[in-house]
Amino acid sequence: MFYDMVRGWFKKSAGNYNAFVKALLINDVEAMNEYMNVISEEIFSNFDVGTKPSKLQPERLVSCYDCNGVANGSSLNDSSNLYAMTRKSSRFYHGFVLGLMVDKRDDYIIKSNKESGFGRYDVMMIPRDTENSNLPGLILEFKVINHSMEKSLEETVKSALQQIEEKKYDTELLKAGVKKENIRHYGFAFEGKKVLIGTDE
């Protein structure tokens, strides 16, 4: 459901939903940031409270944690609820990025909100063929800025990357046969419409 909605949004715009995935796989962090900020601005411009009717039907948006096409969580009934939620949690961005990622289901096992190491990662992408493929194993962690603890999005990205390391989220990828040197970590930090993506490489 969420996958279909994401694709539907891009049909109405000039955006290419594959561009982000391509940038991710070649580790082009600059392109990832540019893409996500353009899309974030476009999406949230349509949800500004009291400005104009939403083109994106916010009542259909749900939190998505199942890449097999099953969307879970409560639907959002108005734009103010959506905007408030995205300021307080990373669930919307989590679901949105998952909607982009599932296009790679043939190459990756895509998991979300599962246990690995000493905690639960947000998104993990495990190459289906770990022996004959050069595809990297990927871990994505999402955080909304906590102004009581962080002064900038850069600090939020750092916090996300530290969590990946401290909680040993690599454990599942390593058990699946992905080599340590072929694992990448990405921290996603959010503040309103602003997005910052960073890596520990």
Model-predicted regions and their roles:
Residues 1-168, 195-201:
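Extended alpha-helical interface modules used as scaffolds for assembling large macromolecular complexes
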Residues 172-201:
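Domain-level recognition of nuclease-like catalytic cores that cleave nucleotide substrates
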